[in-house]
Amino acid sequence: MGIKNLYKRGVMGLYGVAYAVAALAMTVTLDVSTVAAHGERSQEPFLRMRTVQWYDIKWGPEVTKVNENAKITGKFHLAEDWPRAAAQPDFSFFNVGSPSPVFVRLSTKINGHPWFISGPLQIGRDYEFEVNLRARIPGRHHMHAMLNVKDAGPIAGPGAWMNITGSWDDFTNPLKLLTGETIDSETFNLSNGIFWHVVWMSIGIFWIGVFTARPMFLPRSRVLLAYGDDLLMDPMDKKITWVLAILTLALVWGGYRYTENKHPYTVPIQAGQSKVAALPVAPNPVSIVITDANYDVPGRALRVTMEVTNNGDIPVTFGEFTTAGIRFINSTGRKYLDPQYPRELIAVGLNFDDESAIQPGQTKELKMEAKDALWEIQRLMALLGDPESRFGGLLMSWDAEGNRHINSIAGPVIPVFTKL
């Protein structure tokens, strides 16, 4: 293979790159609207209702300037009725769901302890989290707390809109190295990254161009079947292969040695586990046994029959049922509702057949109805098509002194088309 053929094949490879760039330019110029939020609705209801049960979540402040700090705090309960179809949280990582890195995460704490690598969490227990963020990209962004569970995937919590003002060009993220030098990680070694991208892409384009310029699959297959592979092996192919192999090894070795000399003090990627004890179990005088549950499809209502016992010394009243980040409340729950909680996740359709307080030592049957269009808007009615048709959530009650008691409830649910 002569120099002309080699040049021809390289040029044809560049043509392929030009076509790809043209296709990319067309996608950029087309008027395509971006997806802003609510991707969590695509998750299966059994993951959102019966795995991580979020509560007391706060986002703040609502408006943040570039380079200013924000925070997401809250708690979550790992449901006792964890579905068999999902891997258990033996290896979990607390994360933040956002549309690209619009914030920089400064720190994460679980129960007051740093949490920067994965670790085990205990089913049936509660955890408190705090995530500190720094505003990076201006805009209106939908932010979620999120728990990534190995083999189960990300489990997103409720989301709220957080606004960032200012200019992206003003963002800086200074970090102090072990050598005492301070760098801006937003722009540090940007030219170096571009250089290596260009180097490896150029080698790849040249390699592809060499072999795509010649006859492709069918002609080569016919030659191979008729005459063997000797005719397909060009001496120049072997030379090019050796040159690129040696060049690749030299670049890898040289780049490694250069990096070692320029940055002698490095911290390797951590491979351990974060182990944090769960929150202490709070005394709860309320016990609940689910006896029946159904979902009214046309009425968009979950109806649950339960047997409730108050083992305490103070009357208690139910006021909230929260599931998948949706808070169903009645007049009692409204008194304790956080006014900053996203309005699109609040439903006032929580009713009990007996709204009176449960007296100390009393056991009675209650029928709860959680009714709202949010069942369909949030795509939770799809639980009827899950491999385990079961519901789950947190039922909250308050006593006369304002103390809150939280019960995680779950049970099988059947669809109905008339009120039973």
From Swiss-Prot:
Pfam families: Monooxygenase_B. Its EC number is 1.14.99.39. InterPro entries: NH3_CH4_mOase_B, NH3_CH4_mOase_suB_C, NH3_CH4_mOase_suB_hlx_hairpin, NH3_CH4_mOase_suB_N. Its cofactor is Cu(2+). Cu cation 1 binds at H38, H144. GO terms for molecular function: ammonia monooxygenase activity; metal ion binding. Cu cation 2 binds at H142, H144. The keyword Transmembrane helix applies. One of its GO terms (cellular component) is plasma membrane. It is an enzyme of class 1 (oxidoreductase). It catalyses: AH2 + NH4(+) + O2 = hydroxylamine + A + H2O + H(+). Residues 1-25 form the signal peptide. Part of the ammonia monooxygenase complex, which catalyzes the oxidation of ammonia to hydroxylamine, the first reaction in the process of ammonia oxidation to nitrite. The physiological significance of the two gene copies is still unknown. The soluble ammonia monooxygenase is a nonamer composed of three alpha subunits (AmoA), three beta subunits (AmoB) and three gamma subunits (Cytochrome c1 PetC). This is Ammonia monooxygenase beta subunit. It comes from Nitrosomonas europaea (strain ATCC 19718 / CIP 103999 / KCTC 2705 / NBRC 14298). The gene is amoB1.
